[in-house]
Protein backbone atom coordinates (compact mmCIF):
# COMPACT_ATOMS: atom_id res chain seq x y z
CA UNK A 1 0.00 0.00 0.00
CA UNK A 2 1.45 3.32 -1.09
CA UNK A 3 1.33 6.58 0.80
CA UNK A 4 -1.16 8.09 -1.69
CA UNK A 5 -3.62 5.22 -1.22
CA UNK A 6 -3.43 5.47 2.56
CA UNK A 7 -3.98 9.25 2.48
CA UNK A 8 -6.97 8.92 0.13
CA UNK A 9 -8.56 6.27 2.35
CA UNK A 10 -8.12 8.44 5.46
CA UNK A 11 -9.72 11.44 3.71
CA UNK A 12 -12.71 9.39 2.54
CA UNK A 13 -13.21 7.90 6.00
CA UNK A 14 -13.02 11.34 7.65
CA UNK A 15 -15.57 12.78 5.21
CA UNK A 16 -18.01 9.93 5.82
CA UNK A 17 -17.64 10.36 9.57
CA UNK A 18 -18.32 14.09 9.28
CA UNK A 19 -21.49 13.50 7.23
CA UNK A 20 -22.79 10.95 9.74
CA UNK A 21 -22.08 13.38 12.60
CA UNK A 22 -23.99 16.18 10.86
CA UNK A 23 -26.96 13.90 10.24
CA UNK A 24 -26.97 12.77 13.88
CA UNK A 25 -26.81 16.39 15.09
CA UNK A 26 -29.76 17.36 12.88
CA UNK A 27 -31.77 14.39 14.14
CA UNK A 28 -31.05 15.28 17.77
CA UNK A 29 -32.06 18.90 17.19
CA UNK A 30 -35.34 17.79 15.63
CA UNK A 31 -36.11 15.46 18.54
CA UNK A 32 -35.33 18.17 21.10
CA UNK A 33 -37.59 20.63 19.27
CA UNK A 34 -40.44 18.11 19.27
CA UNK A 35 -40.01 17.52 22.99
CA UNK A 36 -40.10 21.26 23.68
CA UNK A 37 -43.29 21.64 21.65
CA UNK A 38 -44.93 18.77 23.54
CA UNK A 39 -43.91 20.29 26.88
CA UNK A 40 -45.32 23.69 25.88
CA UNK A 41 -48.61 22.06 24.88
CA UNK A 42 -48.81 20.13 28.16
CA UNK A 43 -48.10 23.28 30.19
CA UNK A 44 -50.78 25.23 28.32
CA UNK A 45 -53.28 22.41 28.89
CA UNK A 46 -52.38 22.32 32.59
CA UNK A 47 -52.89 26.06 32.91
CA UNK A 48 -56.30 25.88 31.27
CA UNK A 49 -57.33 23.05 33.60
CA UNK A 50 -56.13 25.04 36.60
CA UNK A 51 -58.16 28.08 35.56
CA UNK A 52 -61.27 25.96 35.04
CA UNK A 53 -60.87 24.38 38.46
CA UNK A 54 -60.48 27.80 40.04
CA UNK A 55 -63.67 29.03 38.40
CA UNK A 56 -65.53 25.94 39.68
CA UNK A 57 -64.18 26.47 43.19
CA UNK A 58 -65.35 30.09 43.17
CA UNK A 59 -68.79 28.99 42.01
CA UNK A 60 -68.99 26.47 44.86
CA UNK A 61 -68.24 29.21 47.38
CA UNK A 62 -64.77 28.11 48.48
CA UNK A 63 -62.67 30.73 50.18
CA UNK A 64 -65.57 32.81 51.46
CA UNK A 65 -65.66 34.40 54.88
CA UNK A 66 -68.31 32.03 56.22
CA UNK A 67 -66.22 28.99 55.45
CA UNK A 68 -62.95 30.39 56.73
CA UNK A 69 -63.86 31.61 60.21
CA UNK A 70 -62.84 28.33 61.75
CA UNK A 71 -59.56 28.17 59.89
CA UNK A 72 -58.76 31.74 60.83
CA UNK A 73 -59.28 30.90 64.50
CA UNK A 74 -56.67 28.08 64.28
CA UNK A 75 -54.17 30.17 62.37
CA UNK A 76 -54.50 28.66 58.87
CA UNK A 77 -52.75 29.94 55.82
CA UNK A 78 -55.25 32.81 55.77
CA UNK A 79 -57.91 33.93 53.33
CA UNK A 80 -58.74 37.53 52.66
CA UNK A 81 -62.36 38.51 52.54
CA UNK A 82 -65.14 40.23 54.38
CA UNK A 83 -65.64 38.55 57.71
CA UNK A 84 -67.96 39.48 60.54
CA UNK A 85 -66.44 40.17 63.91
CA UNK A 86 -65.70 37.04 65.87
CA UNK A 87 -68.06 36.37 68.77
CA UNK A 88 -66.78 37.59 72.08
CA UNK A 89 -65.78 34.81 74.45
CA UNK A 90 -67.91 34.15 77.47
CA UNK A 91 -66.58 34.90 80.95
CA UNK A 92 -65.44 31.27 81.37
CA UNK A 93 -63.46 31.19 78.17
CA UNK A 94 -64.86 29.68 75.04
CA UNK A 95 -63.73 28.63 71.63
CA UNK A 96 -60.14 29.65 71.02
CA UNK A 97 -59.81 31.62 74.29
CA UNK A 98 -57.74 31.10 77.39
CA UNK A 99 -59.31 29.54 80.46
CA UNK A 100 -59.43 32.01 83.38
CA UNK A 101 -59.88 30.93 86.93
CA UNK A 102 -63.53 30.37 87.84
CA UNK A 103 -65.04 33.16 89.90
CA UNK A 104 -66.01 32.78 93.47
CA UNK A 105 -69.69 33.57 92.68
CA UNK A 106 -71.89 33.89 89.65
CA UNK A 107 -71.85 37.30 87.97
CA UNK A 108 -74.83 39.50 88.48
CA UNK A 109 -77.55 39.39 85.88
CA UNK A 110 -76.87 35.84 84.67
CA UNK A 111 -79.85 33.57 85.10
CA UNK A 112 -79.22 30.36 86.89
CA UNK A 113 -82.76 29.33 87.77
CA UNK A 114 -82.23 30.32 91.38
CA UNK A 115 -80.32 27.15 91.99
CA UNK A 116 -76.89 28.29 92.99
CA UNK A 117 -74.72 25.38 94.12
CA UNK A 118 -73.87 25.46 97.75
CA UNK A 119 -70.21 24.82 98.59
CA UNK A 120 -68.39 25.54 101.82
CA UNK A 121 -67.52 29.21 101.73
CA UNK A 122 -70.25 30.19 99.24
CA UNK A 123 -68.15 29.73 96.07
CA UNK A 124 -66.38 27.23 93.89
CA UNK A 125 -63.80 24.91 95.35
CA UNK A 126 -60.26 25.79 94.45
CA UNK A 127 -59.31 22.29 93.49
CA UNK A 128 -60.09 18.67 93.95
CA UNK A 129 -59.24 19.01 97.65
CA UNK A 130 -60.78 21.98 99.49
CA UNK A 131 -57.92 22.32 101.95
CA UNK A 132 -55.41 22.83 99.18
CA UNK A 133 -53.41 19.79 100.16
CA UNK A 134 -53.45 16.14 99.31
CA UNK A 135 -55.86 13.50 100.43
CA UNK A 136 -56.21 12.89 104.10
CA UNK A 137 -53.95 10.23 105.42
CA UNK A 138 -51.95 9.22 108.46
CA UNK A 139 -49.25 11.18 110.18
CA UNK A 140 -46.45 12.22 107.89
CA UNK A 141 -42.80 12.43 108.88
CA UNK A 142 -41.47 16.00 108.89
CA UNK A 143 -37.81 14.99 109.08
CA UNK A 144 -35.39 17.21 107.20
CA UNK A 145 -32.40 14.84 107.26
CA UNK A 146 -31.38 13.93 103.74
CA UNK A 147 -31.29 10.23 103.06
CA UNK A 148 -28.19 9.45 101.00
CA UNK A 149 -28.85 5.73 100.82
CA UNK A 150 -29.45 4.38 97.33
CA UNK A 151 -33.02 3.35 96.60
CA UNK A 152 -33.76 -0.31 97.03
CA UNK A 153 -35.19 -2.57 94.38
CA UNK A 154 -38.74 -2.01 93.28
CA UNK A 155 -41.27 -3.98 95.25
CA UNK A 156 -43.92 -6.24 93.77
CA UNK A 157 -46.91 -4.66 92.13
CA UNK A 158 -49.67 -4.01 94.62
CA UNK A 159 -53.22 -5.15 94.42
CA UNK A 160 -55.75 -3.08 92.55
CA UNK A 161 -57.41 -0.61 94.90
CA UNK A 162 -61.15 -0.01 95.22
CA UNK A 163 -62.91 2.38 92.88
CA UNK A 164 -63.15 5.98 94.06
CA UNK A 165 -66.38 7.80 94.89
CA UNK A 166 -68.26 9.63 92.19
CA UNK A 167 -67.42 13.32 91.96
CA UNK A 168 -69.89 16.15 92.45
CA UNK A 169 -71.89 17.39 89.52
CA UNK A 170 -70.46 20.35 87.69
CA UNK A 171 -71.94 23.82 87.55
CA UNK A 172 -74.51 24.25 84.76
CA UNK A 173 -73.15 26.29 81.87
CA UNK A 174 -74.48 29.63 80.64
CA UNK A 175 -76.77 29.95 77.67
CA UNK A 176 -74.96 30.88 74.48
CA UNK A 177 -75.57 34.12 72.64
CA UNK A 178 -77.31 34.23 69.30
CA UNK A 179 -74.93 34.26 66.35
CA UNK A 180 -75.00 37.08 63.86
CA UNK A 181 -76.23 36.62 60.32
CA UNK A 182 -73.50 35.68 57.85
CA UNK A 183 -73.82 36.24 54.13
CA UNK A 184 -71.82 34.43 51.44
CA UNK A 185 -69.88 37.01 49.47
CA UNK A 186 -67.38 36.33 46.73
CA UNK A 187 -63.75 36.69 47.74
CA UNK A 188 -62.20 40.05 47.11
CA UNK A 189 -58.56 38.95 47.27
CA UNK A 190 -56.28 36.39 45.72
CA UNK A 191 -56.60 32.79 46.77
CA UNK A 192 -53.21 31.39 47.63
CA UNK A 193 -53.04 27.66 47.05
CA UNK A 194 -50.48 25.65 49.01
CA UNK A 195 -47.39 24.67 47.19
CA UNK A 196 -47.67 21.25 45.62
CA UNK A 197 -45.03 18.55 45.54
CA UNK A 198 -42.04 18.96 43.28
CA UNK A 199 -42.52 17.64 39.79
CA UNK A 200 -40.05 15.49 37.90
CA UNK A 201 -36.92 17.21 36.72
CA UNK A 202 -37.24 18.51 33.21
CA UNK A 203 -34.72 18.06 30.44
CA UNK A 204 -31.68 20.27 30.31
CA UNK A 205 -32.31 23.52 28.48
CA UNK A 206 -30.45 24.80 25.49
CA UNK A 207 -27.16 26.53 26.29
CA UNK A 208 -27.61 30.27 26.68
CA UNK A 209 -25.62 33.08 25.19
CA UNK A 210 -22.10 33.49 26.32
CA UNK A 211 -21.89 35.93 29.18
CA UNK A 212 -19.62 38.90 29.46
CA UNK A 213 -16.06 38.31 30.27
CA UNK A 214 -15.49 38.52 33.98
CA UNK A 215 -12.84 40.50 35.76
CA UNK A 216 -9.37 39.13 35.94
CA UNK A 217 -9.05 36.89 38.94
CA UNK A 218 -6.44 37.18 41.61
CA UNK A 219 -3.25 35.26 41.07
CA UNK A 220 -3.43 31.79 42.51
CA UNK A 221 -1.28 30.53 45.29
CA UNK A 222 2.06 29.11 44.32
CA UNK A 223 1.86 25.40 43.78
CA UNK A 224 3.52 22.99 46.11
CA UNK A 225 6.71 21.27 45.12
CA UNK A 226 6.14 17.89 43.62
CA UNK A 227 7.41 14.72 45.15
CA UNK A 228 10.98 13.80 44.24
CA UNK A 229 11.10 11.67 41.15
CA UNK A 230 12.68 8.30 40.72
CA UNK A 231 16.49 8.30 40.43
CA UNK A 232 17.59 8.39 36.84
CA UNK A 233 19.93 6.00 35.08
CA UNK A 234 23.63 6.39 35.56
CA UNK A 235 25.21 8.59 32.93
CA UNK A 236 28.27 7.66 30.90
CA UNK A 237 31.59 8.02 32.70
CA UNK A 238 33.09 11.44 32.23
CA UNK A 239 36.49 12.22 30.85
CA UNK A 240 39.30 11.94 33.36
CA UNK A 241 40.14 15.29 34.86
CA UNK A 242 43.54 16.88 34.95
CA UNK A 243 45.91 15.97 37.72
CA UNK A 244 45.73 18.29 40.67
CA UNK A 245 48.64 20.05 42.28
CA UNK A 246 50.59 18.01 44.78
CA UNK A 247 49.44 18.73 48.25
CA UNK A 248 51.62 20.00 51.03
CA UNK A 249 53.17 17.37 53.27
CA UNK A 250 50.96 16.50 56.13
CA UNK A 251 51.90 16.61 59.76
CA UNK A 252 53.54 13.76 61.57
CA UNK A 253 51.02 11.10 62.38
CA UNK A 254 50.58 9.43 65.71
CA UNK A 255 52.54 6.33 66.46
CA UNK A 256 50.71 3.31 65.33
CA UNK A 257 49.68 0.59 67.69
CA UNK A 258 49.83 -3.03 66.81
CA UNK A 259 47.27 -4.81 68.88
CA UNK A 260 47.96 -8.41 69.66
CA UNK A 261 44.88 -10.36 68.99
CA UNK A 262 43.97 -13.48 70.83
CA UNK A 263 43.97 -16.72 68.89
CA UNK A 264 40.61 -17.32 67.40
CA UNK A 265 38.49 -20.37 68.00
CA UNK A 266 39.54 -23.60 66.39
CA UNK A 267 38.06 -24.00 62.97
CA UNK A 268 36.19 -27.02 61.74
CA UNK A 269 38.28 -29.96 60.50
CA UNK A 270 39.12 -29.82 56.85
CA UNK A 271 38.21 -32.33 54.25
CA UNK A 272 40.26 -35.51 53.97
CA UNK A 273 43.10 -35.19 51.51
CA UNK A 274 43.89 -37.60 48.69
CA UNK A 275 45.36 -41.00 49.58
CA UNK A 276 49.16 -40.93 49.64
CA UNK A 277 51.56 -43.47 48.15
CA UNK A 278 52.16 -46.74 49.98
CA UNK A 279 55.03 -46.47 52.42
CA UNK A 280 57.83 -48.98 52.99
CA UNK A 281 57.23 -52.13 54.96
CA UNK A 282 57.74 -51.49 58.62
CA UNK A 283 59.68 -53.56 61.07
CA UNK A 284 58.13 -56.50 62.80
CA UNK A 285 56.56 -55.63 66.06
CA UNK A 286 57.69 -57.15 69.30
CA UNK A 287 55.74 -60.21 70.30
CA UNK A 288 53.00 -59.29 72.61
CA UNK A 289 52.30 -60.74 75.96
CA UNK A 290 50.54 -64.06 76.03
CA UNK A 291 46.92 -63.69 76.76
CA UNK A 292 45.00 -65.57 79.42
CA UNK A 293 44.38 -69.22 78.83
CA UNK A 294 41.11 -69.77 77.15
CA UNK A 295 38.51 -72.28 78.05
CA UNK A 296 39.10 -75.82 76.79
CA UNK A 297 37.54 -76.33 73.45
CA UNK A 298 35.39 -79.15 72.29
CA UNK A 299 36.96 -82.47 71.46
CA UNK A 300 38.17 -82.42 67.91
CA UNK A 301 37.78 -85.02 65.29
CA UNK A 302 40.28 -87.87 65.14
CA UNK A 303 43.34 -87.03 63.05
CA UNK A 304 45.07 -89.13 60.48
CA UNK A 305 47.34 -91.94 61.65
CA UNK A 306 50.91 -90.83 62.16
CA UNK A 307 54.05 -92.58 60.99
CA UNK A 308 55.48 -95.42 63.00
CA UNK A 309 58.14 -94.36 65.41
CA UNK A 310 61.55 -95.92 65.69
CA UNK A 311 61.87 -99.24 67.30
CA UNK A 312 62.55 -99.01 70.97
CA UNK A 313 65.32 -100.76 72.85
CA UNK A 314 64.82 -104.30 73.91
CA UNK A 315 63.17 -104.67 77.21
CA UNK A 316 64.41 -106.51 80.30
CA UNK A 317 63.73 -110.16 80.47
CA UNK A 318 60.37 -110.84 81.94
CA UNK A 319 59.43 -112.99 84.85
CA UNK A 320 58.54 -116.54 84.23
CA UNK A 321 55.01 -116.81 83.09
CA UNK A 322 52.19 -118.96 84.26
CA UNK A 323 51.44 -122.28 82.98
CA UNK A 324 50.77 -122.41 79.38
CA UNK A 325 47.19 -122.08 78.45
CA UNK A 326 45.37 -121.31 75.30
CA UNK A 327 45.97 -117.63 74.36
CA UNK A 328 44.73 -115.40 71.66
CA UNK A 329 46.63 -114.39 68.65
CA UNK A 330 48.84 -111.33 69.17
CA UNK A 331 47.67 -108.04 67.74
CA UNK A 332 49.16 -106.22 64.78
CA UNK A 333 51.90 -103.67 65.14
CA UNK A 334 49.89 -100.90 63.45
CA UNK A 335 47.04 -101.14 65.87
CA UNK A 336 49.36 -101.09 68.81
CA UNK A 337 51.15 -97.90 67.60
CA UNK A 338 47.87 -96.07 66.84
CA UNK A 339 46.52 -96.76 70.30
CA UNK A 340 49.76 -95.57 71.85
CA UNK A 341 49.69 -92.23 69.93
CA UNK A 342 46.07 -91.68 70.83
CA UNK A 343 46.91 -92.25 74.45
CA UNK A 344 49.68 -89.65 74.28
CA UNK A 345 47.35 -87.02 72.65
CA UNK A 346 44.82 -87.38 75.38
CA UNK A 347 47.50 -86.86 77.95
CA UNK A 348 48.61 -83.62 76.30
UniProtKB/Swiss-Prot annotation:
**Family as reported in the entry's similarity comment:** Belongs to the cuticular collagen family.
Q: Which Pfam families does this one have?
A: Col_cuticle_N (PF01484), Collagen (PF01391)
Q: Which UniProt keywords apply?
A: Collagen, Cuticle, Disulfide bond, Repeat
Q: Where is this region: Disordered?
A: 76-348
Extent of the signal sequence: none
Which cellular components does GO assign to this protein? collagen trimer; cuticular extracellular matrix
Q: What is this protein called?
A: Cuticle collagen rol-6
- Stretches with biased composition (Basic and acidic residues): 322-338
Q: How does it assemble?
A: Collagen polypeptide chains are complexed within the cuticle by disulfide bonds and other types of covalent cross-links.
Q: Where is this region: Triple-helical region?
A: 152-178, 196-258, 261-284, 288-323
Q: Which GO terms describe its molecular function?
A: structural constituent of collagen and cuticulin-based cuticle
Query: Any idea what job this protein has?
Result: Nematode cuticles are composed largely of collagen-like proteins. The cuticle functions both as an exoskeleton and as a barrier to protect the worm from its environment. May play a role in cuticle remodeling in response to the environment. Involved in body morphogenesis.
* GO terms classed as biological process: cuticle development involved in collagen and cuticulin-based cuticle molting cycle
- Compositional bias (Basic residues) spans? 339-348
Which spans does this entry mark as compositional bias, Low complexity?
A: 194-231
What gene name is given for the protein in this entry?
rol-6
